[in-house]
């Protein structure tokens, strides 16, 4: 897919993967599902769900490294800054030939890398982020989208990046 095609599909993901309500129990269900998907596939990832800057779910699976928690934080910061997936922000920067520094951000606190996705609640907006780190950025993004689609009962083939 081209950058434009990916951005179009991600926009559809961000419009579709929204909750009517999201609480700590929902965070647990989503986090546990991500854990199970990653474990079944032997993926060495860190998984984080944060609401209103409060961490509500975190696990690092075998193979994840201490660096993954820092990547999680920096990717999540991109989502909470722009209220869009970190992969969409990364692709937009790439398309524009810009870096995060061109937008006044620092690499120490923000990562232009896919894998973090906004948690949207209908009628409210972005209330947090769900983040995966440990795979190539497109795969991190796809894993999060898969878990969100399954949690919300949406068909994955209509949403996933190919």
UniProtKB/Swiss-Prot annotation:
Pfam family of the protein (one): HbpS-like
Family, per entry: Belongs to the UPF0303 family.
Phylogenetic placement of the source organism: Bacteria, Pseudomonadati, Pseudomonadota, Alphaproteobacteria, Hyphomicrobiales
The lineage's top-level taxon is Bacteria
Q: Tell me the InterPro entries matching this sequence.
A: PduO/GlcC-like, PduO/GlcC-like_sf, YBR137W-like
Gene3D superfamilies, per this entry? Haem-degrading domain
Q: What is this protein called?
A: UPF0303 protein Arad_3071
């Amino acid at each position: 897919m081209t950058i434009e095609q990916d951005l179009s599909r991600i926009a559809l993901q961000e419009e579709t993967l929204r909750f009517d309500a999201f609480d700590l129990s929902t965070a647990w269900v989503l986090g546990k599902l991500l854990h199970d998907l990653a474990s079944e596939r032997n993926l060495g990832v860190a998984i984080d769900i944060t609401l209103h800057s409060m961490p509500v779910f975190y696990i690092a699976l075998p193979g994840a490294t201490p660096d993954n928690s820092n990547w999680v934080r920096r990717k999540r910061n991109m989502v909470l800054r722009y209220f869009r997936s970190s992969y969409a922000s990364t692709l937009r920067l790439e398309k524009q030939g810009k870096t995060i520094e061109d937008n006044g951000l620092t690499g120490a606190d923000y990562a232009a890398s896919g894998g973090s996705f906004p948690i949207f609640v209908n009628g409210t907006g972005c209330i947090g982020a769900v983040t995966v780190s440990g795979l190539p950025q497109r795969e991190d993004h796809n894993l999060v989208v898969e878990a969100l689609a399954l949690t919300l009962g949406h068909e994955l083939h209509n949403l996933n990046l190919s």
